[in-house]
Amino acid sequence: MKRIILLSLSLVLVYSQKMWGQVNFFDAHVSKYGELEQVLGDKWDKIDSLIVHGPINEADFTTMWKCSFEGKLTVLNLEHAQIENNKIPTRALFKVDRQVIDDPRAYQGVVYLPIRHLILPEGIQEIGDFAFSRMRLEQVNLPKSLRKLGPFSFSSCHWLSTDPLIIPDGITSIPPQCFINCQCFKKLVLPSTLKVIGESAFYNTRIEEVNLPEGLEKIEQGAFAGCNIKKVIIPASLNELPGFLFSMCPYLKEIYIPNHITKIPGSFASWCPLLEKVNIPKSIIEIGVDAFAGDVKLKPIDLPEGLKHIEQDALWYCAIDSIVFPASLEYLGGGSCANWKYIKKIYSLATIPPYCAEDMDNPGDGPFHGYTPNDVPLYVPIGSGEKYRQAFGWNYFTNIIETDKFPTGIVSPKMSNNEQCKVYGRDGKLFIEFPNTPACPVRYSVYSIGGTMIEQGYLTASHTLQMPSRDTYIIYVGNAVYKILM
């Protein structure tokens, strides 16, 4: 019987070895910095899984790098290690002089370190520049003690699939290109302590969902360009928008911009083929070069009174079917309204035609050309028709009509039934009250009975507005319309 049991155990061990392969695990105990290489001895190039106990420094990280680059190490557990100065050293596991080489193992000219799983210890406060760049890293933890990330610290870890990726509370800045080209995680959770997101920090990732926390003060150029984000609500704490912020986001459908922003910068959300909704706040005075260029589904664009400049190619190739240029408009950049193949009517409220610049890419053409038909009705104020017919850019149109009847209504997005609000007037004030916090920002606009717009924007909570005089007002909130006598 005993012989049968022993034989069975032997068979199990042999079978397990065949099933799991040659797993070479090593539990290293070090007593001082720089000792890891000595402790590993001649096993350094045979280990594929390593746990380290005790103090480690930059020299020990170089040893671990060697175990992976020149050996077989793919799993590294540092949860029991004490890292010198609580900081992962700069280029801890990325040696550019050894990895950027002509080598059969190279991917896009770089040999990626084969470590796939990395466990970091609680207690570390900083991860240095390029510390884990260009690795085949799939899983990593960011300890709660972490307070600082270095530029490029996880750059081009294409296979990073820790999902969701949670940036710990206490982090105030995500530096430039920190997670650029990390393409396998879909949800990003940012902390309430975050103040700054650096240039291209999440460029060309596959993020579908991200929270931009209230308190965020600065986002730099291209931070989320090339992502898979579907919807964005920009927090009110942000006072300025950078260029290329959401450019080339192929699944982006909706953007909410807070009401105090004054400029939509160049290439802000260009080449977003599914973008359908974006609000232009009443505070906006300029829409930058290529801001929404190539957004072939972007259709409802309400331009606010106060807008002065629409720059080169800003709305190029959008799906606009009608538009109202406000009386405040002074400048239309070349190509800014080109290739509007669905346009049916245009209104320009300015009595003096806004200046039209020549298209730098198509000399001789102005803002309107290409697929924009020249025979659609262009409605202009009474007495200004001849000025428009003589003005460069506007003289593109053959059907200029003088009128004093300009559109005042705004089509509003729908609210669900459980978001219906209460609208009433009292003591010269208008009250818009929601029983619950809306699930997403709700468009509203307030007009006098004569058609003068009083206010418009997006609501995320109940709102009170001091009205200018006793009158009857029309209020649009979501898909509901209210008539209030003040």
Model-derived features: positions:
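Bacterial Sec-dependent N-terminal signal peptides
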Residues: 1-25
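Low-complexity, Pro/Thr/Ser/Gly/Ala-rich linker/spacer regions in secreted
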Residues: 20-25, 401-417
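Structural signature of tandem-repeat unit edges
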Residues: 23-31, 48-56, 73-86, 99-126, ...
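Acidic Gly/Asp/Thr-rich repetitive segments characteristic of extracellular carbohydrate-active
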Residues: 27-46, 454
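Short, T/G/N/S-enriched strand-turn elements that build extracellular solenoid repeat scaffolds
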Residues: 34-43, 59-68, 87-92, 130, ...
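Consensus positions within tandem repeat domains that build extended binding/scaffold surfaces
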Residues: 92, 128-131, 150-153, 175-178, ...
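Membrane-proximal C-terminal cap and juxtamembrane stalk of leucine-rich repeat ectodomains
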Residues: 368-409
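C-terminal outer-membrane/trafficking sorting elements
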Residues: 412-486
